[in-house]
A protein has these predicted regions:
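Secondary-structure boundary/capping motif
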Residues: 14-15, 118, 172
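Anionic group-transfer/hydrolysis microenvironments
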Residues: 9, 43, 110, 145, ...
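Walker A/P-loop phosphate-binding motif and the immediately C-terminal alpha-helix
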Residues: 2-52, 126, 133
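Flexible, glycine-rich phosphate/dinucleotide-binding loops
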Residues: 12, 46, 113, 171, ...
Length: 216
């Protein structure tokens, strides 16, 4: 199953931290030791999933010490897809960082990589990459950029479920619910940084935009 985490507003809805938490919960909740979840993002950002899951310094981050060398991450997966190589599950997971008893994996990006080249390759091969990862994982979870990237558009199209991280701002909410009807058909909603004193409470959002209570 492919699950995209996304927001229409940059930097306000805690998309990355929400995805990291949900990935961990999905892995811990699984009684099946063979069940695997893999995470990645389609954009470059210093505050990424890797910093949330594997930070060695912050006590506020969920983390686990790991010592893995030699992985090339998402670039290696893109290369395999580009060349038509068929990797085994072992080869896929060798390019990822694993934790939680090898049930949760993260595909990193090269920190010194060119973001424009990465976006071009991800946009071109997005469908094949997702199919590739889904072959060996029960859950593929993507931190999807809110920027107007072609790869973001394609990921949102390919995802089985889109977790929309809402920002409690009336204008931002109105813009989303007026312009993204294609996403709403397969959306589940989170309020990433909930403010109890906001006029746009959970109840108000449910009522105004006619969202089923089980979807927020």
């Amino acid at each position: 199953m492919k699950v995209a985490f996304w927001s229409s507003v940059r930097g306000k809805s805690c998309v990355t931290s929400n995805l990291a938490c949900m990935g961990i919960l999905a892995s811990l909740d699984s009684a099946n030791r063979q069940r695997k979840t893999i995470l990645f993002e389609n954009h470059h950002n210093l505050m990424n999933l890797e910093s949330s899951l594997f930070s060695e310094f912050s006590k506020d981050q969920v983390r686990e010490e790991c010592q893995y060398e030699g992985y090339r991450g998402m670039e290696e997966v893109l290369y395999a897809v580009e060349k038509g190589h068929i990797y085994s599950s072992r080869e896929i997971f060798q390019n990822a960082r694993g934790c939680l008893g090898e049930k949760l994996f993260y595909l990193p990006q090269k920190r010194e990589g060119n973001p424009d080249i990465f976006e071009y390759r991800m946009s071109r091969d997005c469908q094949a990459v997702l199919q590739y990862l889904e072959r060996y994982n029960d859950l593929v979870m993507i931190d999807t950029s809110c920027s107007f990237l072609n790869s973001s558009r394609r990921i949102l199209e390919e995802a089985d479920l889109v977790v929309v991280n809402l920002f409690q701002n009336e204008a931002a909410l109105s813009h989303f619910f007026s312009n993204y009807s294609n996403i709403r058909k397969k959306a589940f909603y989170l309020i990433g940084n909930y403010e109890g004193d906001s006029c746009m409470t959970r109840g108000e959002i449910l009522k105004r935009y006619r969202i089923p209570g089980s979807h927020l």
